[in-house]
Every structure is written in structure tokens, then in C-alpha cells.
Amino acid sequence: MVAVPELWTLDGFRVMNSDRVTVILKRFEAPDEVRMLQKGRFDLVRLGGMTIGRATYEPGWKWSEHVGPSVGATRCHVEHVGLVLSGRATAAFDDGRVFELRAGELFYIPPIPHDSWVVGDQPYVSLHFLGADHYATPNT
């Protein structure tokens, strides 16, 4: 018979412990940090030495209008690796290249100046596996 590991809740996340391994389970419903933005929010969860972000933006959201002024920038300079969960958005570069990000797509955006905005009338939600620590902070 397999022993059931001890389970307890600590500061909004669950910890499972056995004699060989500790597993930490967290949810975005109880993030470690929330960055409230005009027309959106960026939730951060820190886990296993990494920070994962969840971006949720309303229709009409645009980085240069709703994030840029609060961080003192006209374009985002953060490198991103992520996954689009729902909705559509663009990544637009100053040289005229524009890429659409759609639900189910993994994306990489290099750390060169770019703008982004929600496309259509549905909210946009994505996970960010790289760049979350620096997103929507001064000098991003």
C-alpha cells in the first residue's frame, strides 16, 4: 500500500511532502504578485526558481497606451516566451513587422522594442515563461 503524503496549505498554495520529495502546487487565483494595468492585469506566480506570468487584457488594450505611460516607455523591451490561452493579440515592431498571436500558439518575442494590442472583441489571456519578472516595470 502506498502512503499518502502529508498535505498542507501555506500562504495560498499547497505543499505535498513525503520522505523523498516536496511538491508545491500553486494557482493563478492566488498569485504571489498582481500588477494592475489599465484594461488588464498581470499575475505572477513564483515557483521552482522561476516566475510565470498570466496576462489578461480587455478588448481595446494596447501596450503603448495602457502600460507604457506608467513605466516611462513607448515600447516594451522585454524578451517573452509564452503561450496564448485565449483571444488574439499582435506583436508589432518599429520596422513594420506585425505578428498575430492566437489561442494555442507558443510565442517568442525578442528583446527589441515592440508594441502589442488585443485584436477583436474577446479578452486576451497568455502565460509568460520568460520575461515575467520585468514586464510592466520601469524601463521595460
Where do the PLM segments sit?
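Short, charged/polar surface micro-motifs in flexible loops or helix N-caps
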Residues: 50, 58-64, 88-89, 132
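Short acidic-glycine-tyrosine-enriched beta hairpin
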Residues: 95-112
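Ligand-binding loop in jelly-roll beta-barrel domains
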Residues: 110-136
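Glyoxalase I/VOC metalloenzyme domain signal
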Residues: 2, 59-61, 130-140
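A short, N-terminal "cap"/entry segment at the start of jelly-roll beta-barrel domains
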Residues: 1-56, 64
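Glycine- and acidic-residue-biased ligand/ion/polar-headgroup-sensing regions
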Residues: 50, 70-95
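Conserved short histidine dyad/triad with adjacent acidic residue
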Residues: 54-75
